[in-house]
């Protein structure tokens, strides 16, 4: 009987121990485990949100980069068109200025040529008159006429 009483005492002590553990130890342990599970779940969900936010930010950055590249290409294209336009305008302006200067130079050359011709005509007329006076002043003979004409030709 003593074994039965010991066994019954141990069983009763075990039941009291289990009841005390269930009443006083188990609830704080369960609360700590549940809090830890909640913290882990919150951490996982926040990591998932952060990953989604990162993917969204990467997508936005990629889109903005593509848009910036397109805008840069458009700006460069517009600048090249404007450069070509400015070069064409400068070429047309330079060509017009060149034609104007050439026309002015030609006009000056023509005026100078005309003035030189007029001066030359006056000199030729003066020489012809002087030669005619010399011929008329001398006797009319062939040798003298030929000599005077040769001198006039040499002067011209």
From Swiss-Prot:
Transmembrane domains' residue ranges? 13-33
Where located?
Cell inner membrane
Sorted alphabetically, the keyword list is: ATP synthesis, Cell inner membrane, Cell membrane, CF(0), Hydrogen ion transport, Ion transport, Membrane, Transmembrane, Transmembrane helix, Transport
Asked if the record carries the keyword DNA-binding, the reply is no
Any single GO molecular-function term of the entry would be: proton-transporting ATP synthase activity, rotational mechanism
Topology relative to the membrane:
Single-pass membrane protein
Q: GO terms for CC?
A: plasma membrane; proton-transporting ATP synthase complex
Stored CDD domains? ATP-synt_Fo_b
Which intervals of the chain form a coiled coil? none
Asked whether the keyword Glycosyltransferase is assigned, the reply is: no
The protein's matches in HAMAP family, at most eight in alphabetical order, are given as: ATP_synth_b_bprime
Quaternary organization: F-type ATPases have 2 components, F(1) - the catalytic core - and F(0) - the membrane proton channel. F(1) has five subunits: alpha(3), beta(3), gamma(1), delta(1), epsilon(1). F(0) has three main subunits: a(1), b(2) and c(10-14). The alpha and beta chains form an alternating ring which encloses part of the gamma chain. F(1) is attached to F(0) by a central stalk formed by the gamma and epsilon chains, while a peripheral stalk is formed by the delta and b chains.
- Entry similarity comment: Belongs to the ATPase B chain family.
Q: What does this protein do?
A: F(1)F(0) ATP synthase produces ATP from ADP in the presence of a proton or sodium gradient. F-type ATPases consist of two structural domains, F(1) containing the extramembraneous catalytic core and F(0) containing the membrane proton channel, linked together by a central stalk and a peripheral stalk. During catalysis, ATP synthesis in the catalytic domain of F(1) is coupled via a rotary mechanism of the central stalk subunits to proton translocation. Component of the F(0) channel, it forms part of the peripheral stalk, linking F(1) to F(0).
Tell me the protein's name: ATP synthase subunit b
What species is this protein from?
Answer: Aeromonas salmonicida (strain A449)
């Amino acid at each position: 009987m003593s074994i039965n009483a010991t066994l019954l005492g141990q069983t009763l002590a075990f039941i009291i121990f289990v009841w005390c553990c269930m009443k006083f130890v188990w609830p704080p342990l369960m609360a700590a485990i549940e809090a830890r599970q909640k913290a882990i779940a919150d951490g996982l969900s926040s990591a998932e949100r952060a990953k989604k936010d990162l993917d969204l930010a990467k997508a936005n950055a990629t889109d903005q980069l593509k848009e910036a590249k397109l805008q840069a290409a458009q700006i460069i294209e517009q600048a090249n068109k404007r450069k070509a336009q400015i070069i064409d305008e400068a070429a047309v302006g330079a060509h017009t200025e060149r034609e104007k200067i050439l026309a002015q130079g030609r006009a000056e050359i023509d005026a100078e040529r005309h003035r030189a011709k007029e001066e030359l005509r006056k000199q030729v007329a003066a020489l012809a008159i002087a030669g005619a006076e010399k011929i008329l002043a001398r006797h009319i003979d062939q040798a003298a006429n030929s000599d005077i004409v040769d001198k006039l030709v040499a002067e011209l």
